[in-house]
Amino acid sequence: MAKKIQAIRGMNDCLPTQSPLWQKLENAVKSTVSAYGYNEVRMPIVEETNLFSRAVGEETDVVSKEMYTFDDRNGDSLTLRPEGTAGCVRACIQNSLINRDEQRLWYMGPMFRHERPQKGRYRQFHQCGVEVFGLNGPDVDAELIMMTARLWRELGINEHVRLELNSIGSQEDRADYRTALVAFLEQHIDVLDEDCKRRMHTNPLRVLDTKNPEVQAILGDAPRLSEYLGEESKAHFAGLCELLDAAGIEYTVNERLVRGLDYYNRTVFEWITESLGAQGTVCGGGRYDGLVEQLGGSATPAVGFAMGLERLVLMLETLELTDVRRSVDVYVVTAGEGTMMVGMKLAEQLREAIPGVRVMSHFGGGNFKKQFKRADKVGAVVALVLGENEVAENTVVLKDLVGGEQETYNQAEVAEKIAALI
């Protein structure tokens, strides 16, 4: 027997039993972003490696350790996208979307990072991202947070997530703070682990994000970034907090929140849950006002967020919020000479007459008992039964699979009866 080929570690199949919950989540996301007037954009999965090196940062874990990078036959270095913002910015610049106008965009799709697979963290994972270009006020930052809060309510998880906010200021604000932070860390060099020592010289703000409890203990005495913010950054953050207060959205200011990608400035935020253990962040984002210019476009303010769909699916499963629409409404049962053709024709008529109805025809033979068992297995609410007598009389038996009642109707009127049942 030939050896079975397995899926790549950390890259998972989404099976028919799982896809309805995914569809429920994806539909909720789409309806939410549409309610705010945002438009979908679709970018390639593969981009030039240089895009992520320039946008995300050479010294970040994503670029230095986690990307799937390869040379194509022309010798060009290409990468499976590890995140969506850089590609979205590239698409906007290349297609002149943000030269003279604001853009409010969203996208959804797979991302790739070579990490150690564990619950809630995979090598192929899916994100929904929302990006806004051309607006620099705190009002649009607040709208994005309000958008996510609306999605949590629609999914029923709003009581199981909490919002953390911070302002990391402008590049100029951070320059003086970085100097003060490095000086502080050098005084405690013996406490720092190797990862923190590396970050101290490459991106010292990321030390604030450490999970090492010994380092966390000394950071309580570290310089506070808020004390180094300029007046514009302070006013922007105060405006955001005021808008969230007015909207009734609760939040905590976390001065150690810095996010893991280099392009952020001013507002950063995360939605966190306690339902998933270690992998607690389900959504994160912030401002990246310098990224468009950094990638060759004109100076353009921008803000966005991304949410991990696998983690949201895990949350829905953990909280037992898995009620999804059944996959089949009507099952067509046929037995006897000439019944299959009539049954398939009747199924097509139902699809034409009732928008969105899902009709499954039985194939492969079998007696009525076997066919009704299959109808029950796929979750059908109604069965249409056609035997030779029904075909001869142009009728069909409609059986309510929930209540058990059944009636015989003319084939021309059965669509109206089914519409009332489902």
Swiss-Prot record:
InterPro entries linked: aa-tRNA-synth_II, aa-tRNA-synth_II/BPL/LPL, Anticodon-bd, Anticodon-bd_dom_sf, His-tRNA-ligase, HisRS-like_core, HisRS/HisZ, HisRS_anticodon
UniProt record, GO biological process: histidyl-tRNA aminoacylation
Gene3D superfamilies given in the database record: Anticodon-binding domain (3.40.50.800), Bira Bifunctional Protein, Domain 2 (3.30.930.10)
Subcellular location: Cytoplasm
Domain of life: Bacteria
Enzyme class, spelled out: ligase
Recorded catalytic activity of this chain's protein: tRNA(His) + L-histidine + ATP = L-histidyl-tRNA(His) + AMP + diphosphate + H(+)
Primary location recorded for the protein, binned into one broad class: cytoplasm
GO molecular function: ATP binding; histidine-tRNA ligase activity
EC code: 6.1.1.21
Any one Gene Ontology cellular component term annotated for this protein: cytoplasm
Alphabetical UniProt keywords: Aminoacyl-tRNA synthetase, ATP-binding, Cytoplasm, Ligase, Nucleotide-binding, Protein biosynthesis
Pfam family of the protein (one): HGTP_anticodon
NCBIfam families the record matches: hisS (TIGR00442)
Description of how the protein assembles with itself and partners: Homodimer.
HAMAP family referenced in this protein's UniProt entry, alphabetically: His_tRNA_synth
Similarity comment: family membership: Belongs to the class-II aminoacyl-tRNA synthetase family.
Protein name: Histidine--tRNA ligase
Origin species: Vibrio campbellii (strain ATCC BAA-1116)
